[in-house]
Structures are given as structure tokens and as C-alpha cells.
């Protein structure tokens, strides 16, 4: 139990017991001290100020959860940090319309979250763990991935957790990272990539003419994305440049151009020039503060 010091004008022992009892009651256990005090006042009752409630509840370890139901559990997977290429990959599957109504092609895409390079893809007529396993094995071979160096993140779909896929990852020494079903936004890199793909001007409004045409379109997209697309999340360099470690030199050159422009015409600049420093780390599922930081109110005990 936390040791909380109460001012001399604080609530009496009887009042503290009443605060605990009221706060745990079915009518108030879902509410914050601010809400409890307001509703008690509406009913013509006063037990203490908001700060009194906070101190009493903190003393009794009741600030976090007072319901009978199970406390909320943070379902987000652990944060994954990449400081170099080929440390964390993200992958997913998206649908592409085929000429046959109600039938689809399945595009498997693997992206390095540090460089944003597409490191592997196939376009298939079925969705399966076997296709996924072959994709990951081929990408690992092409990128020269050593055992124990790579984490592969995906959602919780059947191809991602199929026996063939998991056995392949174990054999390759790749650590799987699966999202939780209740978390909708913990594969943002793949989601962003698919949005870029489907908003390309050349992406058909209807269906592709056939599998070969669709594969050729994806091939051109991957080439453009990796080697021509100046990605906003990596300081507008191409994924290939960043994957090969060329981004720092490119960004240094840009910084020099801006500094020279400022030197020639300083009145145009009110502060620093644009930030062209290289991004040194990328995080997937960064942990935000999952608790409410409680600052005790400064209202006096009255």
C-alpha cells in the first residue's frame, strides 16, 4: 500500500473510508475522481475534493482498476526496432481483381521496414501458407539473411501462421511476429504499401485482363517503387538507395545545397534549414504510454 501524506485539513479516517466505499460502488467504479465529485455534488453530497479522492484511491491502490471485470490487457505485440536493412520485414497479402467476377489474384508483398524496399513478391491465384513460405525462403536467399538476424512481422491470417510457413521460418532462423486479432493497425508498413500500390494512376479501375497482365503490372510497380519512388518516410530518397546505404550521401548533398542557399540569402530563413539528416532507426508497433499519468490537482482541501 502506498504511503500518502495528507495535509492536516485533509479528510478524516471516516471520510476516507466513505471515499473508498463510494468509489468502489457500482454507480461510480467506472468513473474518475473528477466525475465522481461532480455527480456527488449533483446529488447534494460532498465527501472531499478531487485531490482528496486521488490521494485516498492511490493510498489504497485503486487508481488503475476498480471493476469486477478483468482489467484491460495491452494486446499490442512487442515493439520491433530496426537500425539497419534486413532486421525487420513486414509482409501481407492483398487482393487484385481478376477478369472473372468474384475471383481474385493474391499479391504477396514483403517490405523491409528500415529501407522500405520491396524484397520479394509473387502474384498467385490462391492464398496459401505454401506460397508464403516459398516467398520468404527466396527473399532470404536473395538478401543473404543469416539465421537469427531477421524478424518477420505479419497479421494473424491463416497463411501467416500455417504449419508450412512456421516450419520454414524455424528452419531459416527467422523470428515470426504476429499481430493480435483485436489490434487493427499494427501492420502499418504493409498497409501503407498497398495503399500506394492501389492509388497508382496506372492501377485499373476495374479488373486486370489476366494473370500475366497483372504480374507484369506488379513487376513495373515494384521496379518504380524501389528505384524511382522518393519515399516521404525516409527523407524522400528511394528505397533502393536507403537499402544500399546511399541515402546519407544524398542527404548530405541536399543539406549543403540548403545551407548554401541560406548563406546567399539569409533573410529568407527564419530558423534552421530543412532537416535532411538520415533516419537512424525505425520502429514497428512503438509502445505509447498505456496508462494515464495522474497529476494531483492543486485545489485546496475545504
What are these regions (language model features)?
Residues 1-88, 183, 242-255:
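Basic, flexible linker segments flanking DNA-binding modules
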Residues 47-49, 62, 76-109, 113-224:
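RNase H-like DDE/DDD metal-dependent nuclease/strand-transfer catalytic core used by mobile genetic elements
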Residues 51, 222-249, 276-277:
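Charged, gly/pro-enriched flexible loop segments at helix/strand junctions
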Residues 257-260, 266-289:
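Intrinsic disorder at enzyme termini
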Residues 292-298:
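Conserved small/polar residues in nucleotide/adenosyl-binding loops
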Residues 20, 37, 54, 215, ...:
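Non-transmembrane alpha-helical segments in soluble domains
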Amino acid at each position: 500500500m502506498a504511503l500518502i501524506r495528507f495535509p492536516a485539513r485533509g479528510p478524516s479516517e471516516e471520510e476516507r473510508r466513505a471515499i473508498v466505499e463510494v468509489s468502489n460502488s457500482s454507480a461510480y467504479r467506472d468513473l474518475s475522481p473528477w466525475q465522481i465529485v461532480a455527480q456527488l455534488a449533483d446529488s447534494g453530497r460532498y465527501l472531499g475534493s478531487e485531490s482528496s479522492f486521488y490521494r485516498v484511491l492511490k493510498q489504497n491502490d485503486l487508481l488503475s482498476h476498480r471493476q469486477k471485470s478483468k482489467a484491460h490487457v495491452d494486446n499490442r505485440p512487442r515493439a520491433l526496432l530496426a537500425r539497419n536493412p534486413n532486421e525487420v520485414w513486414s509482409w501481407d497479402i492483398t487482393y487484385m481483381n481478376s477478369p472473372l467476377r468474384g475471383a481474385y489474384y493474391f499479391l504477396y508483398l514483403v517490405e523491409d521496414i528500415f529501407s522500405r524496399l520491396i524484397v520479394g513478391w509473387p502474384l498467385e491465384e490462391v492464398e496459401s501458407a505454401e506460397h508464403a513460405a516459398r516467398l520468404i525462403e527466396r527473399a532470404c536467399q536473395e538478401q543473404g539473411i543469416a539465421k537469427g538476424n531477421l524478424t518477420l512481422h505479419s497479421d494473424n491470417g491463416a497463411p501467416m501462421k500455417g504449419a508450412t510457413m512456421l516450419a520454414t521460418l524455424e528452419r531459416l532462423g527467422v523470428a515470426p511476429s504476429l499481430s493480435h486479432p483485436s489490434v487493427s493497425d499494427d501492420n502499418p508498413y504493409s498497409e501503407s504499401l498497398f495503399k500506394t500500390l492501389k492509388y497508382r494512376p496506372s492501377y485499373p479501375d476495374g479488373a486486370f485482363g489476366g494473370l500475366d497482365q497483372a504480374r507484369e503490372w506488379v513487376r513495373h510497380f515494384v521496379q518504380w517503387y524501389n528505384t524511382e519512388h522518393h519515399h516521404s518516410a525516409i527523407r524522400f530518397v528511394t528505397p533502393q538507395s536507403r537499402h544500399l546505404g546511399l541515402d546519407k550521401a544524398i542527404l548530405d548533398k541536399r543539406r549543403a545545397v540548403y545551407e548554401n542557399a541560406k548563406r546567399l540569402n539569409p533573410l529568407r530563413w527564419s530558423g534552421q534549414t530543412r532537416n535532411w539528416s538520415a533516419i537512424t532507426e525505425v520502429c514497428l508497433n512503438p509502445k505509447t504510454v498505456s496508462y494515464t499519468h495522474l497529476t494531483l490537482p492543486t485545489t485546496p482541501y475545504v
